[in-house]
From Swiss-Prot:
Gene that this sequence comes from: gcvPB
Cited HAMAP family: GcvPB
Protein name: Probable glycine dehydrogenase (decarboxylating) subunit 2
Record field: catalytic activity: N(6)-[(R)-lipoyl]-L-lysyl-[glycine-cleavage complex H protein] + glycine + H(+) = N(6)-[(R)-S(8)-aminomethyldihydrolipoyl]-L-lysyl-[glycine-cleavage complex H protein] + CO2
Binding partners and assembly: The glycine cleavage system is composed of four proteins: P, T, L and H. In this organism, the P 'protein' is a heterodimer of two subunits.
InterPro entries (UniProt xref): GcvPB (IPR023012), GDC-P_C (IPR049316), GDC-P_N (IPR049315), GDC_P (IPR020581), PyrdxlP-dep_Trfase (IPR015424), PyrdxlP-dep_Trfase_major (IPR015421), PyrdxlP-dep_Trfase_small (IPR015422)
GO BP field: glycine decarboxylation via glycine cleavage system
Amino acid sequence: MKNQDQALIFEVSKEGRIGYSLPKLDVEEVKLEDVFESDYIRVEDAELPEVSELDIMRHYTALSNRNHGVDSGFYPLGSCTMKYNPKINESVARFAGFANIHPLQDEKTVQGAMELMYDLQEHLIEITGMDTVTLQPAAGAHGEWTGLMLIRAYHEANGDFNRTKVIVPDSAHGTNPASATVAGFETITVKSNEHGLVDLEDLKRVVNEETAALMLTNPNTLGLFEENILEMAEIVHNAGGKLYYDGANLNAVLSQARPGDMGFDVVHLNLHKTFTGPHGGGGPGSGPVGVKADLIPYLPKPILEKTEDGYRFNYDRPEAIGRVKPFYGNFGINVRAYTYIRSMGPDGLRAVTEYAVLNANYMMRRLAPFYDLPFDRHCKHEFVLSGRRQKKLGVRTLDIAKRLLDFGYHPPTIYFPLNVEECIMIEPTETESKETLDGFIDKMIQIAKEVEENPEVVQEAPHTTVIKRLDETMAARKPVLRYEKPAPVQV
């Protein structure tokens, strides 16, 4: 039943069928022509489906059953931290005092919500080792851009208009160079060494008086901790640059190490990842930015302050970069993150990291005999394999990912980081049991054996999903991006 073909909602449509009846009009009827200019009025009626309420419910329920999420199965998407989202978060976020307020209310009427946001900021300050935090950015890349704009404002305020370059590792998230470009910087790539870490000699080569910042994820996207981080910070700071922390992998160091103690000047966090706000289609993000003291004047306004009379937003920020989002962040996600932090406590957050790292290393060691391991050393919260061995037998990493669909698993991240050939990037998170990990590992081993014994099974996968293998060339060259009503059948 789950895998049967599903008609489009337009194909379910029946002329004259309605799903909802409006009450009888009890006010004066107004014609569109009397309100809008003709340029804004449709010439032809929109081709909207005409369906009953039951049709709608069955249609979208059937589609939802095809979705894969953390609540329905293992989701080892590397660098995404697809951990289970505790349902107590949802209960707290639905409290009337949080769910039914409006951002334009008088501050005196939402002091409880403001207290929660202020306390969340204080928790994040402690977790990261920063001097203050703003909750305004909406998600990770938005936080990156905000942090880079703060760095830009800092340099310009100090007359360093020639600092136009941001350095990123060759293993960096794609959003790092993208955010730097949008913020008006030129990106310079620093190479990784044979151990998967930033090459210090290459870093010394590219750092100069034009360097605005070095962006790093620590541990990096190979799942390896940048053990030379203090020396890297010294190199950048001695050149007058700032050190930026991409918090995508913070799950690997919670209550174990703090970016602020490593020498980072700016950090963005992903509350929708590390701190269990639903993501991956489940809800909006939240990308708070933390800074050291010398960058505080440039934080986006307003900033949330605690006074003797309660909490208030301070708009008197002459050096601020301005607003980066209407109102003050995605409040509902912040409530969920606050609930998670308070539920876990410092010891719980430490355990999060310990189990995340344990799970990743366990999986890596079990899979290492069957796939190439580019960097054979202890990893942190995630690790990368390579499908080079399988590629020599005619099977690509993409084929392996599609074969996993047959077993009900969401595939890992593939072909990223870019500096690993046929990359397979796996992040199990701390919330998965050994039994779940073993089930996935067993299927990965089965696929590796199929590649050697019956490669066609993998090359032609998936076999059990509703949608089989797509014609990727045709999809790229002649994409169908909108519904087109089929022509009438000629009799």
